[in-house]
């Protein structure tokens, strides 16, 4: 992985800007749906860790050690783990909720990462995701396809044209609810594992 995520202070500043320009309420809504033992998958610099209800027992996970150093400053009592989505270092069925915010666009093998999420979720658990996805507008999808190679290199692996909802369903989840923000092609949704 290369790109902005390798420069945690810059990544953090960009996230702060995005939260002030509209992403903040979406991230709060994502955290509000977390229950019990929760894995914050791709917690980055820890901006979302402070949003959880005190009753939630969160664990932050990110593949970039430098991001976790910054996350530690924000969430001193939250356990933090340096690992990738494709190889989660947890037993099967230990989480009530897995939260992922703008992560699966950058996971190299999204199908494998989602299989791992399904493995660590309890049978009645929930996956809560906020993702930007491939546009349903033909012209915008074509633009996403066009910029994808350059954007992926600059951004640390982000693929703006991924069909994330379809990938989630193929990984064995049923999407229960979702909100859309068409102008940004953002989706906030909750999914349950099919057994």
Model-derived regions, located:
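A short SAM/SAH-binding and catalytic strip from SAM-dependent methyltransferases
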Residues: 97-109
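C-terminal lobe and adjacent flexible extensions of AdoMet/dcAdoMet transferase-like proteins
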Residues: 188-195
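C-terminal alpha-helical "lid/dimerization" subdomain adjacent to the S-adenosyl-L-methionine
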Residues: 5, 14-17, 130-182, 188
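A short acidic, Gly/Pro-enriched loop at the edge of an enzyme's catalytic core
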Residues: 86-98
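Class I SAM-dependent methyltransferase SAM/SAH-binding core
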Residues: 39-40, 44-87
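A short glycine-rich, Lys/Arg-flanked "PGG" loop and its adjoining helix->strand segment in the class I
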Residues: 111-123
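Conserved class I S-adenosyl-L-methionine
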Residues: 1-35, 47-48, 70, 144-151
